[in-house]
Design a protein with these regions (language model features):
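A short, glycine/acidic-enriched catalytic loop
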Residues: 5-13, 81-105
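Active-site histidine-acidic residue metal-binding/catalytic motifs
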Residues: 1-64
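Structural recognition of the beta-strand scaffold that forms the well-ordered cores
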Residues: 36-41, 74-78, 92-95, 119, ...
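Active-site-adjacent mobile loop/cap segments within catalytic or ligand-binding domains
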Residues: 70, 77, 121-176
Length: 176
């Protein structure tokens, strides 16, 4: 998400903005641990260039190129969830291919530090972007924008930083 693609929306709250904030904080924390972080975006843009009928595919293809480059060890795809049933809440990790152990490790940290009890889920193998990724990594839904209580936290810098810090600690622990 980014640029013309807002992701999920609740009134004037856009997933793309919260994702970007969490990603920038995550970059900060991982860098403090000594990691070299490459962001697919560091501002409100997407990776489609110009006006195109295939904007989403172009965006995905450009993200895939960044992630699959020879210097990348891992990807963390940051998102927010949204369901019509507003009772659901909590950060949840989705994985593809051989990334189940990484997903379990990060989910455990999220559950222990963000008051959730979600379980990991596999990304369907037909999902365009994730079937083309060659690197270790996961998609992290950092919470539900559809849940009023969680939404009220997700829009705050304090909680965005907390989510980013927990993810960073989980990644560092995974490599220990």
């Amino acid at each position: 998400h980014g640029g013309k693609d807002p992701g999920t929306v609740y009134k004037d709250i856009y997933e793309k903005d919260i994702n970007l904030s969490i990603s920038l904080y995550l970059e900060e924390y991982l860098s403090e641990y000594g990691a070299t972080v490459v962001l697919t975006r560091d501002s409100d843009n997407d990776l489609s260039y110009g006006e195109t009928n295939h904007r989403k595919k172009t965006d995905f293809d450009n993200r895939i190129k960044i992630i699959n480059n020879e210097y990348t060890d891992m990807y963390l795809s940051i998102h927010l969830n949204y369901l019509s049933n507003k009772k659901y809440y909590g950060a949840q990790v989705f994985y593809n291919k051989d990334n189940e152990n990484l997903a379990k490790s990060i989910q455990e940290y999220l559950n222990n530090n963000l008051e959730t009890d979600r379980e990991i889920k596999e990304i369907p193998s037909s999902t365009y972007m994730y079937k083309k990724l060659e690197k270790r990594g996961v998609l992290i839904e950092c919470g539900f924008l559809s849940n009023a209580s969680e939404r009220s936290k997700l829009i705050t810098e304090k909680y965005q930083r907390k989510v980013a810090k927990v993810i960073a600690e989980a990644v560092v622990n995974y490599y220990k």
